[in-house]
Swiss-Prot record:
Belongs to the FlgI family. It is found in: Periplasm; Bacterial flagellum basal body. The basal body constitutes a major portion of the flagellar organelle and consists of four rings (L,P,S, and M) mounted on a central rod. This is Flagellar P-ring protein. It holds the Pfam family FlgI.
């Protein structure tokens, strides 16, 4: 206990000795094997106000409903395949099972329609087993849905939809029935996986841990992983990790990147982006073609015929922007200021950045998403 207190005190002293840009280890890395697991299930939502599946078009909904009734000893008469169930909808149920979740605990679930239900508002999910990728049942879901959207339709065909009424959530809607085995307490080492691979950050993590616990305790496996010696006793291992995850490490600077989303026009320029000496001018040419036909009317008693003579008018207009120059080592602020001065739109800025990259003047990775 005394050694643990001394270790905590040393941790606090080392944490305060670093700059304000340091980040906690838990914010930049995770423990290998300690993660959430995805669960999925298929079930029925009942109690809808006439907004359920049109079962004549979604036969799987009616089949699921009949199978459920048969489990309660209710036999559906033959030839009932055309029954319309307006208050029932087939849904997919999915959730993330947190690490170390134990039987009896609850997790939030999301419920989404997989048929043609218009809205799940006001519905209740019936008991639905939720399986993992191995096919085993890890949780049972059931409960009333919370739907943020709604759908309304008038008799004249007018319709209004707010948000997405065909999907909802049930807070604490699934009860955990089985734990996922974890290798957390196995072996005498643990592996820390960086959220973003960086050799500088990995080295700084190793240096910080070894400075606190002694040489050789931490070892970098590569730019994204650090192996740490850990106690074998589970209780001591938890105390040990509670200290490690609160260590503050100054992460390495990210590589210079420019991210472009061509669909939305969003452009993100990283802090370390620089431009080599270059001169840029950007203009746009607009060509407008209009049809203005002329009607030719012959004189009276001339024997001629009225004719339509086609006539096209072509107008070309080019917007000229002044040329601006980038000097050596131009930074992000100067790039943004220069582009704003010429009034370039996001689409124009994309073209400018792509041209600078092709010219070898943009000292950054250009990534289009």
């Amino acid at each position: 206990m005394i050694k643990l207190k001394q270790l905590i005190a040393a941790t606090l002293l080392l944490s305060t000795a670093f700059g304000v840009h340091a980040e906690r280890l838990k914010d930049i890395a995770s423990i290998s094997g300690v993660r959430a697991n995805q669960l999925i299930g298929y079930g029925l939502v009942v109690g809808l106000n006439g907004t359920g599946d049109q079962t004549t078009q979604t036969p799987f909904t009616l089949q699921t409903f009949n199978n459920m009734l048969s489990q309660f000893g209710i036999k559906v008469p033959a030839g009932s395949g055309t029954v319309q169930l307006k208050n029932v909808a087939a849904v997919a149920v999915y959730a993330d099972l947190p690490a170390f979740a134990k039987p009896g605990q609850t997790v939030d679930i999301t419920v989404s329609s997989i048929g043609n239900s218009k809205s799940l508002r006001g519905g209740a999910l019936l008991m639905t087993p939720m399986k993992g990728v191995d096919g085993n049942v890890y949780a049972i879901a059931q409960g009333n849905l919370v739907v943020g959207g709604f759908d309304a339709e008038g008799r004249d065909g007018s319709k209004i939809t707010v948000n997405v009424p065909s999907s909802g959530r049930i807070p604490g809607g699934a009860s955990v029935e089985r734990s996922v085995p974890s290798g957390f307490n196995q072996g005498n080492t643990l592996t820390l996986n960086l959220n973003r691979s960086d050799f500088t950050t990995a080295k700084r993590i190793v240096d910080k841990i070894n400075e606190l616990l002694g040489p050789g305790v931490a070892q970098a496996l590569d730019g994204g992983s650090v192996r740490v010696t850990a106690p074998l006793d589970p209780g001591q291992r938890v105390d040990y990790l509670s200290i490690l995850e609160n260590l503050e490490v100054d992460p390495g600077q990210t590589a210079a990147k420019v991210i472009i989303n061509s669909r939305t026009g969003t452009i993100v320029i990283g802090q370390n982006v620089k431009v080599s000496p270059a001169a840029v001018t950007h203009g746009s040419l607009t060509v407008t073609i209009t049809e203005d036909p002329i009607v030719s009317q012959p004189g009276a008693l001339s024997g001629g015929q009225t004719a339509v003579v086609p006539r096209s008018r072509v107008n070309a207009q080019q917007e000229l922007h002044p040329m601006f120059k980038f000097g050596p080592g131009t930074t992000l602020d100067e790039i943004v200021r220069a582009v704003n001065q010429v009034g370039a739109a996001p689409g124009d800025l994309m073209a400018i950045l792509e041209a600078l990259k092709q010219a070898g003047a943009l000292q950054a990775d250009l990534i289009v998403i």
